[in-house]
């Protein structure tokens, strides 16, 4: 399977600093070509979101070089991958909180991490950074962890109401600004021509 990779970030219309960080790598393994990607969006309402997002991306790059080769020598086990990614996110949640306290400012970031193998995808997210599949249409593979998205899932708000709700960017959790985080794992089959 061939992988076409493109990655772009944009500062947007509100922020003075681009607080996005990302890394995308194509890897040759004994199991075939894989793609590992991580995208973090520093929280604009907090100072130094770019520091938090860069720290989490760097941590996942280290995981990729140190741990992924071992996992890739055999078939990827989702549970082992989930535990390792949760540990990266939770340890950096603590590290970012400690650093924030030391320097006296708040910082946080959302995160979405993805591993594509020849036939499966594995995704984990915290916050509202998303992963999509593009085939004949665009399909979101993750769920936002925001107050408004949660209210839509619970039937409190409709999709239409959510689009204009002033609370739509209120996160339920993020790395660095939440005491506890509960990353969500998604997996599925990689579709041909997607």
What are these model-derived regions, one by one?
Residues 1-194:
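PP2C/PPM-type serine/threonine phosphatase catalytic domain
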């Amino acid at each position: 399977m061939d992988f076409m990779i493109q990655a772009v970030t944009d500062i947007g219309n509100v922020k003075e600093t681009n607080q996005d960080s990302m890394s995308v790598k194509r890897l040759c393994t004994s199991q075939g070509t894989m793609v590992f990607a991580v995208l973090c969006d520093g929280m604009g309402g907090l100072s130094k979101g770019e520091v938090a997002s860069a720290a989490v991306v760097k941590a996942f790059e280290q995981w990729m070089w140190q741990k992924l080769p071992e996992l890739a020598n055999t078939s990827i086990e989702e549970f082992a991958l989930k535990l390792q990614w949760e540990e990266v996110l939770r340890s950096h949640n603590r590290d970012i909180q400690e650093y924030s306290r030391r320097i006296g400012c708040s910082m946080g970031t959302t995160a979405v991490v993805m591993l594509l193998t020849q036939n499966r995808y594995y995704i984990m997210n915290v916050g509202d950074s998303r992963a999509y599949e593009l085939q004949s249409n665009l399909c979101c593979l993750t769920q936002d962890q925001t107050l408004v998205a949660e209210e839509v899932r619970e039937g409190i708000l409709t999709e239409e109401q959510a689009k204009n709700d002033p609370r739509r960017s209120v996160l339920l959790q993020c790395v660095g600004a939440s005491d506890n985080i509960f990353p969500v794992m998604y997996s599925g089959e990689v579709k041909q021509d997607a």
